[in-house]
């Protein structure tokens, strides 16, 4: 008897190598965010800080900061390779940064709840600083449960025979479809756990819109203008 697991999901993993100055600049920005936000009483009892949820001006715009320009370039290179691998060299698509934000997990079991990014097509996470001796705080992807009835629910860990849990190693980049549900498992490291998340929109080139693909924003017209 053979049991076949169908519908693989492409997740790109690459371990980047920033030079010392670039790595230090990114870490400094995340340290400032950590110190400035966690000192506020309303956030002191949280087990995570995510810049897209806190509502502080500019905290979802890290991709505009000088410290993250190297990372932007690396992300562009690997998004291009990801799309070429899936669609071929003539796919004609363009990637756009929607937003990028910092994530800080507390050392005593910090987590991020299960979620997806419905506003984007591709999402990415880059680990700026983690405890290399402690691989807790993994990113876990959850398989879609649409294929099983509610009376025959299969636990995710039993169904995920092909993996789905990624260790947060320093300078690791992960790229994945934004609709893929994911969460951060409890982090128990001795040092800070800093990462940057990106949401990307994938569109056609300007003037190249076609059925079932999102046209370039330059081709949009505000309703009522």
Enumerate the language-model features and the residues they cover:
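Active-site region of the double-stranded beta-helix
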Residues: 69-98, 107-121, 128-133
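Short beta-strand His + acidic residue motifs that chelate non-heme Fe in jelly-roll/DSBH
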Residues: 112-115, 182-189
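Hydrophobic residues positioned within well-ordered beta-strands of beta-sheet architectures
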Residues: 12, 98-100, 122-124, 194-198
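Short conserved micro-motifs at the rims of enzyme active sites and ligand-binding pockets
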Residues: 25, 187, 207-210
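Non-heme Fe(II)/2-oxoglutarate
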Residues: 1-89, 111, 193-195, 199-225
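Catalytic core of non-heme Fe(II) oxygenases with the double-stranded beta-helix
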Residues: 102-175, 202, 206-211
């Amino acid at each position: 008897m053979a049991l076949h697991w169908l519908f693989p999901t492409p997740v790109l993993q690459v371990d980047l190598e920033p030079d010392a100055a670039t790595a230090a600049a990114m870490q400094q920005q995340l340290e400032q965010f950590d110190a400035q936000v966690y000192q506020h009483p309303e956030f002191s009892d949280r087990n995570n800080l995510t810049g897209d949820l806190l509502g502080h001006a500019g905290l979802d715009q890290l991709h505009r900061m000088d410290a993250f320009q190297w990372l932007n370039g690396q992300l562009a290179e690997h998004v291009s390779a990801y799309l070429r691998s899936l669609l071929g060299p003539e796919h004609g698509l363009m990637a756009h940064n929607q937003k990028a934000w910092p994530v800080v997990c507390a050392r005593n079991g910090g987590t991020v709840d299960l979620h997806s990014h419905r506003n984007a097509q591709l999402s990415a996470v880059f680990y700026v600083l983690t405890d290399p001796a402690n691989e807790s705080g993994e990113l876990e992807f959850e398989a879609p449960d649409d294929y099983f009835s509610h009376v025959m629910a299969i636990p995710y860990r039993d169904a995920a025979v092909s993996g789905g849990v990624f260790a947060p190693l320093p300078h690791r980049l992960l790229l994945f479809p934004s609709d893929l549900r994911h969460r951060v498992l409890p982090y128990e490291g001795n040092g800070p756990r800093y990462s940057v998340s990106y949401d990307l929109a994938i569109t056609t080139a300007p003037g190249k819109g076609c059925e079932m693909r999102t046209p370039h924003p330059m081709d949009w017209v505000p309703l009522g203008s």
